[in-house]
Amino acid sequence: MIRSSKIANSLLAAVLAVCGASIGASASAADKVTVQLKWLPQAQFAGYYVAQSKGYYKAEGLDVTIKPGGPDISPVQVIAGNAADVVVNWMPDALAAREAGVPLVNIAQVFNQSGLMLTCKKASGVSTPKDFKGKTLGVWYGGNEYPFLNWMAKLGYKTDSDIKILKQGFNVDPLLQNQAACISTMIYNEYWQVVDAGVKENDLVTFFYEKEGVASLEDGLYVLEAKLKDPAFVARMGKFLKATFKGWNDAVKNPAEAAKIVVAADTSGSASEKVQKRQMENVAKLITNAGTAKIGYLEPAAFERTVKVLLAAGSSPVIKKDPGKAAYSHVVWEAASK
């Protein structure tokens, strides 16, 4: 009986060990977070890299994988295929995807201002939006074209006759080679590529979408709606936001440090600290809530303005109906604020 008792105890211990290992593995798996970026490693995403590098995610008990984006990577497709828990995306693309059947929900809005603009050479004869007529304009597609199409509709231009659209690659060559009068640029990136290529700022004219009244919200964080029904997911993402906001606050406060971290994360070796520092300084201008308790909070009024812009696209609206409050949630942001 003693021997049988020992065997039974041994078996029980083994079972408990296996169960414990299984539970531990489950807990570990639950702490994993994969975030899909919209583009390649650069200061546009410094907050995530800073949070990773300085151990902020680890301090929250998270194992975070940061997946760089690229010209052939759609954040919407990635999260729809369950290859990411959360994605960085622009609101126009996210709302268009939601209407098309991918139920994305905004859980945080990092960028409060738009950095998108059209950059034109004065020599092309463009000095005001009225001069766009008859001109070739470079436009990014893949979800980035929506703000432009809305703007043209507001101006009363037909994109198939009044202007010529050049589907712009993710470079500034069309402007440098005079293939287009204007091209799409971000204040923190492509605009400076034009300047670095030798074009004097005095020879350029820029049109900020923000100032033209056609800006839509850009870099925000999105998850699948069904996931928000899981309290464990909400808690995990709350920790993710808390650490991410800490990373962004640091990046805004110390652009030079952020630049070094971003360069270290760029496995291609093409990034430079000088360029990334400048980019971070310009990105900081778009995160107006950095350093405050409101960082990452999506203002309902800002959401409504974006929806209004997207619906006002003439015969080709980005979305056909107002998605309503279901398209965003503050539940994760509130969890991060506790």
Q: Which positions does each model-derived feature cover?
A:
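Bacterial N-terminal signal peptides that target proteins for export
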Residues: 1-14
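N-terminal signal peptide c-region/cleavage motif recognized by signal peptidases
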Residues: 20-26
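Short, glycine-/small- and polar/acidic-enriched structural segments
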Residues: 31-177, 181-188, 208-209, 215
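A bilobed periplasmic-binding-protein/Venus flytrap-type ligand-binding module shared by bacterial periplasmic
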Residues: 50, 116-126, 217-234, 291
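Short helix-capping segments at alpha-helix termini
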Residues: 55-59, 155-159, 197-200, 268-269, ...
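Pocket-lining segment of extracytoplasmic ligand-binding domains
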Residues: 92-93, 170-174, 178-268
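Secondary-structure end/capping motifs
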Residues: 230-313
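Conserved C-terminal helix/tail region of periplasmic/extracytoplasmic solute-binding proteins
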Residues: 303-338
